[in-house]
């Protein structure tokens, strides 16, 4: 790992466990909000490892692939659809876009925000904060947990259309068979649990050599 976050080998947990600073929470899991209206940071919750908490697991719940081929006459249509469900990722890219106001997710900058959670007395949070505090003050400066997203993604990985040239057309050629194909790769994806305006593709995420995401 690096900074305040990274992977950790924790007894009884997957090797893909991610640790970092976390949002302070009540005993029933509600986020704790401080007097200024921002999230509190609590490093002593969940699994304490080197003063940091468990903030995610990069291992997906499951991966499914659907491949099919349809042939009619001399024409063949093939596709490969992939679904990766679950797993967490830490993204400095999305953090920067949101924190710096570079995505449509941060429009209406003059509107006040009220973060979901409770105050120290247990009452629902009613503290209003501005756009900059919401995204920069919490997402960039706040706990690592806020920069961790679900990495689920649906993807149309491959599509191909092939035409087999009739053999009679090749009688006067040295070729016994010929085909013409058009192929496309990574034509569509939807990382449906990431901010829409970031257009983020979890497949490009990585921390170099290691087991992070």
Q: What are the functions of these language-model segments?
A:
Residues 45-54, 59, 107, 111, ...:
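Extracytoplasmic loops and strand-loop junctions of Gram-negative outer membrane beta-barrel proteins
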Residues 1-58, 98-99, 115-122:
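Conserved small-residue
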Residues 1-2, 94-103, 193-205:
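Flexible, surface-exposed loop regions and adjacent strand-edge segments
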Residues 72-75, 175-177:
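Strand-connecting loop/turn motifs
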Residues 15-17, 86-175, 179, 184-185:
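Extracytoplasmic gating/loop element in the C-terminal half of outer-membrane beta-barrel translocons
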Residues 70, 79-83, 180-186:
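Transmembrane beta-barrel strands of outer-membrane/channel proteins
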Residues 62-68, 75, 156-161, 213:
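Hydrophobic, lipid-facing positions within transmembrane beta-strands of outer-membrane proteins
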Residues 74-79, 168-169:
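Repeated loop/turn-to-beta-strand initiation elements of outer-membrane beta-barrel proteins
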């Amino acid at each position: 790992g690096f900074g305040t976050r990274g992977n950790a080998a924790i007894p009884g947990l997957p090797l893909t466990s991610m640790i970092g600073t976390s949002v302070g929470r009540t005993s029933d899991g509600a986020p704790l909000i401080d007097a200024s209206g921002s999230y509190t940071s609590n490093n002593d919750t969940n699994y304490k490892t080197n003063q940091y908490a468990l903030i995610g697991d990069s291992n997906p719940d499951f991966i499914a692939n659907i491949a099919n081929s349809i042939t009619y006459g001399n024409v063949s249509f093939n596709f490969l659809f992939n679904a990766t469900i679950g797993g967490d990722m830490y993204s400095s890219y999305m953090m920067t876009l949101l924190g710096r106001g570079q995505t449509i997710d941060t429009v209406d900058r003059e509107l006040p925000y009220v973060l979901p959670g409770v105050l120290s007395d247990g009452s629902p949070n009613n503290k209003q904060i501005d756009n900059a505090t919401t995204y920069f003050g919490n997402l960039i400066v706040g706990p690592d947990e806020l920069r961790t997203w679900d990495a689920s993604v649906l993807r149309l990985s491959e599509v191909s259309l092939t035409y087999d040239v009739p053999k009679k057309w090749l009688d006067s050629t040295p070729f016994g068979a010929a085909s013409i194909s058009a192929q496309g790769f990574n034509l569509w994806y939807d990382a449906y649990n990431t901010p829409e305006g970031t257009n983020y593709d979890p497949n490009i995420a990585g921390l170099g050599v290691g087991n992070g995401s």
